[in-house]
């Protein structure tokens, strides 16, 4: 062997290894599933490369996975003829570069998660140390020489050029030196059961090196004629039998070895759905996704006609840890062409919002040598995609029939559905049927648009909703006062993505979606008398509206008498086409935003005042007596700033607001302001205040 180079494990990988080695796990058997799954991935890669360049298979034309238990040396080897690894791959992939999932997996483990989740985090190789004290990886890639990686997980590993070892041709051989209490994994029966349990549906042949004992009878003469063989495979039976002719016969046991194919199942998607058991679907799902739990729902179908393909789609029980990690290639639907695996992160096959759906698609119509580039232009793929989306929505509707299952599904994937409303204009209406919201009338349950429509008041033309940070924040919002009083139901949209979704949805079942926080809210059930009364009130408050607008300047676009609030003195509404307060909050939180757009979209605020509120009535009287009264200006600023808060906006200058409150407290407590002039020295003058803040600060 050439000289060995020693490398230190990256810190996180080292921590992971010590967790795996020093913690007791009951289901250590998953190591085999993980290593076979890695072998299958390596075979996928070389098969895909060979579609465009046949010579890639020259080193080893056969594609296989082999398991070799060796009882005398207490080793189990997993051999594949996959793509293999170069020296750089060995160093990087097995030790010096931590994958994004390493840290997350450790956190999950420490939080009590099951070790069998390891494959989902991309660190399945290290599960070998659940059963092995030492691991040796021999590998040969077409572009490099054969190398050996070795480690006892003691903080470092060695990599050596393999000059003496048996040439692999191409591929990887992982040899596990089993711990003394893990020797069950050398038993043929145990290995067969494990492959059947976890890896039955791997699409490459998995062979086990098995031992066969046969009995053979030979006569004494034959025995003497043959030279004595040093054959450990022959065992002489003590039992001798005399034949009629007086010659003796001997029984000899012969031990031979052969490769036995263990996974004989044909691909599950080629079978009829009615022939497949729940358990088979569950086993296939687990081998496909590395999930340790069963799936929530499955859809198995075939499309026939001009285009033919078969598919199985699964919905997991929970969202993966990196569901919205845009840097990660989506490994959701595996694409096969005539049973040959082509690729598994094919973005053209399913839209991004359905990236949580797992499954396989097998088409007979696509060309075998299809590449990522030609996929984009492929018409067949567009038809497949359309069908997959349709079937996914059907599957979600089937889940919705069971309330408990749908609650689980909605908790995990509601954001995806809302993203679908935003992205998929063709299926917007169908996806809208799947949405659920809390409302002013739904209590602890969530309601659908469909159910909302059945409960609408007579003469109600619109669906009312309010957006905000949380259910608690919107429940007592001043915007809901009149709507609640008149018995209208209002949907609470409290997920950040709701803002984007409702911006695209606009209507449901011919009924417009109307925000309770934007101007233009019209309630149709007003009597003539109420209208008359409101007009009179508007007139009497006209001057106050002008005074408030003068004091606030550019902070608000206009000041009007409200017909949406009942108890609160005032509120701030946004323009019908501008951002809501909640949207403004969301946009402020985005680092990479267009600030010119922010200034334009967020500055259209209208102050609505409540003519029936005592504070407003008193303010009207004071303003009419003397509109330059200092207390009027102070009250208007204070009302504006509290309205910002109750309407869901944020304060640009919280210190000024606090100082204003303190001044009011002093007035209430009859403390003479002049005594504390110094203390209040920093308090800005109100007139300046208005001028200073008149330019609405951009949401920057």
From Swiss-Prot:
Induction: By heat shock and infection by avirulent and virulent bacterial pathogens (P.syringae). A motif (TPR repeat-binding) lies at residues 696-700. Expressed constitutively in roots only. After heat treatment, expressed in most tissues. Levels also increase after heavy metal treatment. One of its GO terms (molecular function) is ATP-dependent protein folding chaperone. Functions as a holding molecular chaperone (holdase) which stabilizes unfolding protein intermediates and rapidly releases them in an active form once stress has abated. Functions as a folding molecular chaperone (foldase) that assists the non-covalent folding of proteins in an ATP-dependent manner. Molecular chaperone involved in R gene-mediated disease resistance. Required for full RPS2-mediated resistance through interaction with RAR1. Possesses probably ATPase activity. Belongs to the heat shock protein 90 family. This is Heat shock protein 90-1. It comes from Arabidopsis thaliana.
